[in-house]
């Protein structure tokens, strides 16, 4: 019997890809995918468990589904993803409203779980397969707008940073075979996807587990032969960026000059304690070389404030580093001591102080963004229109310098209707609350 199944995906784009795969699996099994959990037979909450705050968000969503269930507007709740993997016992014992739990190694069991929770008899299955066998490829039902899609090229992580739980939740690093990736990318291009966003926990390591060699540059050259307009890269580790990769990014016009390179900190002692392989000088050298060889490059990074070992001196060093390097985009987060990590056992500043430092870093970054925005006024940029903003009463979109969800937008006027998913040239004329404004030019 077909059931109506609704999916809620939380957390990162990699998790979103897992959700798209589960939707395809459920649909292939004969069930219906519905947008709203209200009135559905089953709601699947695909959780993030990277940070305590992400787990709190997941629990809030589960409790919302539990309320629908209590009101008779939903029949069953299935919890999947990283929080399910990390805290399966807590989910089962503390959330009796949950009818099934699937870990990150068991996404392929989702259709079976739907059938089991809906069957008479009150089964409450818990699937915890080997995380090294997490399904990577296969059919997807895209949940993104038609003009962009993600291509996840690897699963897991071998970096083992002292503050991070990802290897415990996703396993060791596993690259997907290149021919499989090219087949999937070809299907996305044929479906009309214009911006391909290449993702993994660390894309620079791609291929090293297959034959011992870095293969990201070779993969990108093949992807550039397909009918995409933009190819965007998330997340690169600075110590694995090769000369071949830099040359490929610089030479291939479809690869946008926008690189997301998480550094987390710049102090050498902190980097070493956190099991990062970089130093402040090695990071500087990579950034300098990238800017010299890739015209118009926009850099994005991630910063953690309040890491173990960070006193006022180290914090000021971090602020100065951001000012000196003028990194155009940065996500700043307070240190969260995660259970089971080495960093959680180390002495660190109180959460209130980590939050204060986070806010100060955000202020530093805001000044850098304002300076960058002022520097590009008068430029004409190719912008991917994403629709009309009623609030701003203008069209809204992104140039190569703005990635999906995490960066600002460009608000622009035009003398004709611009369709969502259409590229248009925009002259940048002003700024608005840290974002750019402009006028379409034909």
Where are these regions (language model features)?
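Short glycine-enriched, charge-decorated loop/helix-capping segments at active-site entrances
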Residues: 49-50, 170-171, 210-213, 272-278, ...
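Conserved SAM/AdoMet-binding glycine-rich loop
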Residues: 77-79, 86, 190-313, 323
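Terminal RNA-binding accessory module
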Residues: 337, 345-442
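Conserved, mostly hydrophobic/aromatic
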Residues: 181, 198, 233, 261, ...
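Structural recognition of alpha->loop->beta junctions
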Residues: 93-109, 217-228, 251-256, 317-329, ...
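Short, hinge-like loop/turn segments at secondary-structure boundaries
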Residues: 95-96, 117-120, 214-216, 249-251, ...
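Proteins enriched for Cys/Gly/acidic motifs involved in redox and nucleic-acid/cofactor modification
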Residues: 1-206, 244, 259, 281-292, ...
């Amino acid at each position: 019997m077909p059931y109506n199944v609704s999916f809620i995906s939380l957390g990162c784009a990699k998790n979103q890809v897992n959700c798209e795969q589960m939707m395809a699996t459920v649909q292939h099994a004969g069930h219906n995918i519905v947008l709203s959990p209200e009135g559905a037979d089953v709601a699947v909450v695909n959780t993030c468990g990277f940070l305590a705050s992400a787990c709190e968000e997941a629990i809030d969503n589960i409790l919302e589904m539990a309320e629908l269930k209590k009101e008779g507007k939903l029949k069953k709740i299935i919890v999947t993803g990283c929080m399910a993997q990390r805290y399966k016992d807590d989910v089962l014992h503390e959330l009796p409203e949950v009818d099934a739990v699937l870990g990150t190694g068991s996404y392929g069991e989702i259709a079976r779980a739907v059938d089991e929770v809906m069957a008479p008899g009150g089964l409450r299955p818990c699937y915890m397969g080997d995380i090294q066998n997490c399904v990577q490829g296969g059919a997807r039902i895209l949940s993104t707008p038609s003009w962009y899609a993600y291509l996840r090229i690897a699963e897991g992580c071998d970096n083992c940073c002292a503050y991070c739980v990802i290897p415990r939740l996703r396993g060791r690093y596993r690259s997907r075979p290149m021919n499989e990736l090219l087949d999937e990318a070809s299907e996305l291009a044929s479906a009309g996807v214009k911006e391909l966003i290449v993702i993994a926990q660390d894309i620079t390591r791609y291929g090293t587990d297959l034959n011992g060699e870095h293969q990201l540059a070779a993969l990108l050259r093949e992807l550039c032969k397909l009918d995409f307009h933009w190819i965007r890269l998330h997340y690169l580790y600075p110590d694995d960026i090769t000369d071949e990769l830099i040359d490929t990014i610089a030479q291939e016009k479809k690869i946008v000059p926008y690189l997301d390179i998480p550094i987390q900190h710049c102090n050498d002692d902190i980097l070493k304690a956190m099991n990062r392989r970089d130093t402040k000088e090695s990071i500087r050298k990579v950034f300098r070389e990238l800017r010299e060889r890739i015209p118009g490059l926009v850099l994005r990074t991630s910063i953690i404030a309040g890491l173990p070992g960070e006193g006022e001196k180290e914090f000021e060093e971090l602020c100065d580093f951001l000012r000196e390097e003028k990194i155009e985009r940065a996500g700043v987060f307070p240190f969260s001591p995660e259970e089971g990590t080495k960093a959680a056992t180390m002495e660190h500043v109180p959460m209130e102080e980590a939050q204060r430092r986070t806010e100060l870093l955000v202020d530093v970054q805001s000044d850098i963004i304002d300076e960058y925005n002022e520097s590009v006024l008068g430029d004409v940029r190719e912008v991917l229109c994403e629709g009309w903003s009623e609030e701003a009463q203008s069209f809204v979109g992104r140039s190569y310098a703005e990635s999906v969800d995490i960066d600002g937008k460009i608000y622009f006027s035009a003398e004709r209707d611009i369709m969502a998913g259409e590229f248009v040239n925009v002259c940048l004329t002003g700024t608005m609350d840290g974002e750019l404004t402009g006028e379409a030019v034909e």
